From Swiss-Prot:
Top-level taxonomic group: Eukaryota
Protein name: Protein jagged-2
UniProt organism field: Mus musculus
Biological classification of the source: Eukaryota, Metazoa, Chordata, Craniata, Vertebrata
Extracellular domain ranges by topology: 24-1082
Described function: Putative Notch ligand involved in the mediation of Notch signaling. Plays an essential role during limb, craniofacial and thymic development. May be involved in myogenesis and in the development of peripheral and central nervous systems.
Keywords on record: Calcium, Developmental protein, Disulfide bond, EGF-like domain, Glycoprotein, Membrane, Notch signaling pathway, Phosphoprotein, Repeat, Signal, Transmembrane, Transmembrane helix
Length: 1247
């Protein structure tokens, strides 16, 4: 035994050693990388040479041997006035000998990572890198002292080997980038880089947040970039130690230690731990609670093993005896005549009682009797009908019906015959409806369908409407075709032609579109502008918010962040903390604990820096600790308000105090002390030293020159001026020309700090450190430049679906309806006001109550008297008037025999792929079958056990409104739900999410008059998003998109309220799309231009036809001879206009024509006298010409028969008359004597 105990001891010590090593692991590292050191003269800080005080150069430098330089680093707490002595409280380090008087090292990069890795393993690290580990929360402020030393193997005291000492007090945050520091000391110039990095598995600005991924007994999680724990699949809880059990497992009676299990508690059993274990030895009983034995019918006793119906279970009496149950497990037999015995087994006159049934003959035998049975019967008393169906005589699946001395086969439709052995000709009944022909098959038939039809009997019209109609057109399915009914403004076979430029709804966010000839115009609502109303106007200038609320611009709207005491759109309505007195049990500083823990639990509403004091009316007040203020004591009082730091010092606000970070050249609590740079003697006793700000000046003795009086020849050397300054030797002194950004006698003072302009936002304080900066953020902000608001709502502090409002260093819980309290932990008891009347019982529910009415009363408050009405029947069940029930996802109510149900399409029923056929939940309705879900429908595994009941045809009506499509119109809205995958329950599918949305009361309320369709699918924008397409059916008479918009927003409002649904609690963002983006109209350019050109071409044709007809009429008129006028004014023009008398006319000689032309030229028409009449027929006076002119003035409206005649009136000299056209008119107005034919005219011309 002793040997065994000593054997265990080394292992225990080894375990303790491992734990100690683990406990001493650092939280982070301070890293310093030396880049360069320049000691031009090879001197020590005392002025002596490194290896003796002999000077060999003419300039006075040390030339016999160079220094063996190495560096020591001391890291300690922040000191306003740096003291080089004292312990290095944060750590220290040193380098090996790096070089001589001056040397350069490679720049810092991955060297720190490599050195840190080698330092852990004990390997060699980069010589110029110093790594100081720390095992405490990094305070961000520090003091760094860097010393350069000369290595000497002799016994020279250390202080005499110091080359240079520089110091830096500042702030630095953990990050990967390096910060550069430059120091110009009395003797040497140093360049180095520093940074702080957290060790692996440590996070935050102080490296004290530990998170190491693990998958063991203590947790199952990974770590994100901020050190937060992210549970692995199948695990939950703060430490991710709680396993997610099998879906359906009764957690009251079981649990699990491995994800997906369901391990039952003591006394429970079954797949889901929902079956109790009965009392041991229970024979004929069951249990409701563990270790009970509830007997079945006819059984009794402690173990239910006593037969209370022995006669019914054993039938002991024979020969027709009647069995009587006497006691448990006891019986008596009442024997018929002729039988005796306990069981009536002995016969005296066996056949006396006619024991043989069904015509059997009885014969007495020594043991009793025997029955000779007729055909078809069997048994001791011929009471058993011989089962002729036992041999399965019916073929082809026929059903056998046993009969007396025979059987009958009930055959399937495809078979006939006595035993269903003949194939029936199913085509005789003409089952095919829309087919070319019917073909009889063995056990069935086949229909050769016409084009456009399908199905077993060709009874299904193939839907040709899938995705045919564009721009929201309604597709009408035809036989082997389709027809698109286009909305207003569109046309074409597929509604692809846009007539109305507003039909595509180009105006966004509620803008009203006006169609113009060359485009459209959007009339934007208040707060919007732009061509498509896409530009937000600043609705917060001036601010509409009252009572000090802050205004935020939203998309087309604004939001007022109201204080606690006010609400409403503009924060103008005072809030009532306890409306209606319903929350009288609520304490302003906490909540009332349950019966098991009496008292009031604190809510933490005042945060870690305040004490809550309850006030009347459920209000509270926060008494803040010193240094804090605000409603929730969340604001740290700014102690830097009065700018206490002097000389450009940076003030850092702390709790009830402040700290000054001084620039180079100043120190002290308020940066009001200029350290003496003349200590120790930088002039090496060769001159007088004068102290400056962050510098010094040496007035050298005769014979010495230089900044430190180190040379006898030159005032300038390569390092007299710092930071790239140029040195000019002026004989007795020197002058430095500093580069941009630096000033001072030797260019040691920076003009522009790295904090100008201030890169830190949200009240952060910038602390410059060389060429970089660090931001000290106010409480509630974090990040390199204080841009990230710390999430005060993580972990979730609000219970029961309350929404956490994250502020700056505070949070507030906005409770779901029915809950109240600082953290929404209290369920408001709506039954406190006794709302139920007439003796009804009030049952408190979440955000409401339910009244259990006495007989004869109904209604929400039992205020209605029940009147005899007709019940409603649904699925074989009767429901009384006024009652409500659920049918799938719809709610129904009975109104005097009429079922009033919501119209929501409930989708496909889930089914268990691995379920037994006897399980009702795993079976599909008739005509449907359980199929696996489509790939990608699982939102949170495992989902492989569940499928969907799918029919041959899709259940929802055909609609173009589908998820993952760009279709939006007056009857289509699209919702995009984003989920926090860590909060989604295991086994959740897209179908389960869709079913949950369909079951919302807001969804059922919207589906009152039309069928509401909600179709879901995974969104293409992300793995944790689901798209929901919302539409109505039918949608033919929808005037606008108001119905679909109100429905979509009602569903979104119900989702954001969340309630107690664990699935809706995981929703982090909801996006609503109800307006189609304005599309390009270039596709309509060609049809529009064609239409314009067609109109222009038609107009040209009409004008050409009109012009041609006009010219034709003018030519016809020019061919007609004109009548003589009263004064012969047309005579001179007659040879020109009369075609009959033109040169070369028919029948006219050349000479005759000249004479006529000569006479016409010398003819002067006399003036017409009043009342002179032309020669005409008797009885015609001056009125004849007027009548003729009147006839001429009628134009072409007279009878066309007048065109058949040519009327001429001649003067005395007919050769000079000018023909005028005359119109034919009936009556005496026509002078037939003046009418001549063309032949007469030609004859007259020859004469």
């Amino acid at each position: 035994m002793r040997a065994r105990g000593w054997g265990r001891l080394p292992r225990r010590l080894l375990l303790l050693l491992v734990l100690c090593v683990q406990a001493t692991r650092p939280m982070g590292y301070f890293e310093l990388q030396l880049s360069a050191l320049r000691n031009v003269n090879g001197e020590l800080l005392s002025g002596a040479c490194c290896d003796g005080d002999g000077r060999t150069t003419r300039a006075g430098g040390c030339g016999r041997d160079e220094c063996d330089t190495y560096v020591r680093v001391c890291l300690k707490e922040y000191q306003a006035k740096v003291t080089p002595t004292g312990p290095c409280s944060y750590g220290y380090g040193a380098t090996p000998v790096l070089g001589g008087n001056s040397f350069y090292l490679p720049p810092a990069g991955a060297a720190g990572d490599r050195a840190r890795a080698r330092s852990r393993t004990g390997g060699h690290q980069d010589p110029g890198l110093v790594v100081i580990p720390f095992q405490f929360a990094w305070p961000r402020s520090f003091t760094l002292i860097v010393e350069a030393w000369d290595w000497d193997n002799d016994t020279t005291p250390d202080e005499e080997l110091l080359i240079e000492r520089v110091s830096h007090a500042g702030m630095i945050n953990p990050e990967d980038r390096w910060k550069s520091l430059h120091f110009s000391g009395h003797v040497a110039h140093l360049e180095l880089q520093i940074r702080v990095r957290c060790d692996e598995n440590y996070y935050s600005a102080t490296c004290n947040k530990f998170c190491r991924p693990r998958n063991d007994f203590f947790g199952h999680y990974t770590c994100d970039q901020y050190g937060n724990k992210a549970c692995m699949d199948g695990w939950m809880g703060k430490e991710c130690k709680e396993a997610v059990c099998k879906q359906g497992c009764n957690l009251l009676h079981g649990g699990c230690t491995v994800p997906g299990e369901c391990r039952c508690s003591y006394g429970w059993q079954g797949k889901f731990c929902d079956e109790c274990v009965p009392y041991p030895g229970c024979v004929h009983g069951s249990c409701v609670e563990p270790w009970h034995c509830d007997c079945e019918t006819n059984w009794g006793g402690l173990l239910c093993d006593k037969d209370l119906n022995y006669c019914g279970s054993h039938h002991p009496c024979v020969n027709g005896g009647t069995c009587i149950n006497a006691e448990p497990d006891q019986y008596l037999c009442a024997c018929p005549d002729g039988y005796l015995g306990k069981n009536c087994e002995r016969a005296e006159h066996a056949c006396a009682s006619n024991p043989c049934a069904n015509g059997g003959s009885c014969h007495e035998v020594p043991s009793g009797f025997e029955c000779h049975c007729p055909s078809g019967w069997n048994g001791p008393t011929c009471a058993l009908d011989i089962d002729e169906c036992a041999s399965n005589p019916c073929a082809a699946g026929g059903t056998c019906v046993d009969q007396v001395d025979g059987f009958e086969c009930i055959c399937p439709e495809q078979w006939v015959g006595a035993t269903c052995q003949l194939d029936a000709n199913e085509c005789e009944g003409k089952p095919c409806l829309n087919a070319f022909s019917c073909k009889n098959l063995i056990g069935g038939y086949y229909c050769d369908c016409l084009p456009g039809w399908k199905g077993i009997n060709c009874q299904i019209n193939i839907n040709d409407c899938h995705g045919q109609c564009q721009h929201g057109g309604t597709c009408k399915d035809l036989v082997n075709g389709y027809q698109c009914v286009c909305p207003r403004g569109f046309g074409g076979r597929h509604c692809e032609l846009e007539y109305d430029k507003c039909a595509s709804s180009p105006c966004r966010r509620g803008g009203i579109c006006e169609d113009l000839v060359d485009g459209f115009r959007c009339h934007c609502p208040r707060g919007l502008s732009g061509l498509h109303c896409e530009v937000d106007m600043d609705l917060c200038e001036p601010s509409p918010c009252l009572n000090g609320a802050r205004c935020y611009n939203l998309e087309g709207d604004y939001y007022c962040a109201c204080p606690e005491d006010f609400g409403g759109k503009n924060c103008s309505v005072p809030r009532d903390t306890c409306p209606g007195g319903a929350c009288r049990v609520i304490d302003g500083c906490g909540f009332e604990a349950g019966s098991r823990a009496r008292g009031v639990a604190p809510s933490g509403i005042c945060g870690p820096h305040g004490h809550c004091v309850s006030l009347p009316g459920g209000n509270f007040s926060c008494i803040c600790d010193s240094g804090f203020t605000g409603t929730y004591c969340h604001e740290n009082i700014d102690d830097c308000m009065g700018q206490p730091c002097r000389n450009g010092g940076t003030c850092i606000d702390e709790v009830d105090s402040f700290r000054c970070f001084c620039p180079s050249g100043w120190e002290g609590e308020l940066c009001d002390i200029n350290p003496n740079d003349c200590l120790p003697d930088p002039c090496h006793s060769r001159g007088r030293c004068y102290d400056l700000v962050n510098d010094f000046y040496c007035a050298c003795d005769d014979g010495w020159k230089g900044k430190t009086c180190h040379s006898r020849e030159f005032q300038c050397d390569a390092y007299t001026c710092s930071n790239g300054g140029t040195c000019y030797d002026s004989g007795d002194t020197f002058r430095c020309a500093c580069p941009p950004g630096w000033k001072g006698s030797t260019c040691t003072i920076a003009k522009n700090s790295s904090c100008v302009p201030n890169p830190c936002v949200n009240g952060g304080t910038c602390v410059g450190s060389g060429d970089s900066f660090s931001c000290i953020c106010r409480d509630g902000w974090e990040g390199r430049t204080c841009t990230h608001n710390t999430n005060d709502c993580n972990p979730l502090p609000c219970y029961n679906g309350g929404i956490c409002v994250d502020g700056v260093n505070w949070f507030r819980c906005e409770c779901a309806p029915g809950f109240a309290g600082p953290d929404c932990r209290i369920n408001i008891d709506e039954c406190q006001s006794s709302p139920c009347a007439y003796g009804a019982t009030c049952v408190d529910e979440i955000n409401g109550y339910r009244c259990s009415c006495p007989p004869g009363r109904s209604g929400p408050r039992c205020q209605e008297v029940v009147i005899f009405t007709r019940p409603c029947w649904s699925r074989g069940m009767s429901f009384p008037h006024g009652s409500s029930w659920m049918e799938d996802c719809n709610s129904c109510r009975c109104l005097d025999g009429h079922r009033d149900c919501s119209k929501v399409w409930c989708g496909w029923k889930p089914c268990l792929l691995s379920g037994q056929p006897s399980d009702p939940s795993a079976q599909c309705p008739p005509g449907q079958q359980c199929q696996e879900k489509a790939v990608g429908q699982c939102l949170q595994p495992p989902c492989e056990n569940w499928g969907e009941c799918t029919a041959e045809e899709p259940l929802p009506p055909s609609t173009p409104c589908q998820p993952r499509s760009s279709h939006l119109d007056n009857n289509c809205a699209r919702l995009t739900l984003r989920f926090n995958r860590d909060q989604v329950p295991q086994g959740t599918t897209v179908g389960a999410i869709c079913s949950g949305i369909r079951a919302l009361p807001a969804t059922r309320a919207a589906a009152h008059d039309r069928l509401l369709l909600l179709l879901c699918d995974r969104a293409s924008s992300g793995a944790s998003a689901v798209e929901v397409a919302v539409s109505f059916s039918p949608a033919r008479d929808l005037p606008d998109s108001s119905l679909i918009q109100s429905t979509a927003h009602a569903i979104v409002a119900a989702i954001t309220q969340r309630g107690n649904s664990s699935l809706l609690l995981a929703v982090t963002e909801v996006k609503v799309e109800t307006v189609v983006m304005g599309g390009s109209s270039t596709g309509l350019l060609v049809p529009v231009l064609c239409s314009v050109f067609s109109v222009l071409w038609l107009a040209c044709v009409v004008i050409c036809v009109w012009w041609t007809r006009k010219r034709r009429k003018e030519r016809e008129r020019s061919r007609l001879p004109r009548d003589e006028s009263a004064n012969n004014q047309w005579a001179p023009l007659n040879p020109i206009r009369n075609p009959i008398e033109r040169p070369g006319g028919s029948g006219l000689g050349t000479g005759g024509h000249k004479d006529i032309l000569y006479q016409c030229k010398n003819f002067t028409p006399p003036p017409r006298r009043a009342g002179e009449a032309l020669p005409g027929p008797a009885g015609h006076g001056a009125g004849g010409e007027d009548e003729e002119d009147e006839e001429l003035s009628r134009g072409d409206g007279d009878s066309p028969e007048a065109e058949k005649f040519i009327s001429h009136k001649f003067t005395k000299d007919p050769s000079c008359s000018l023909g005028r056209p005359a119109r034919w008119a009936p009556g005496p107005k026509v002078d037939n004597r003046a009418v001549r034919s063309t032949k007469d005219v030609r004859r007259a011309g020859r004469e």
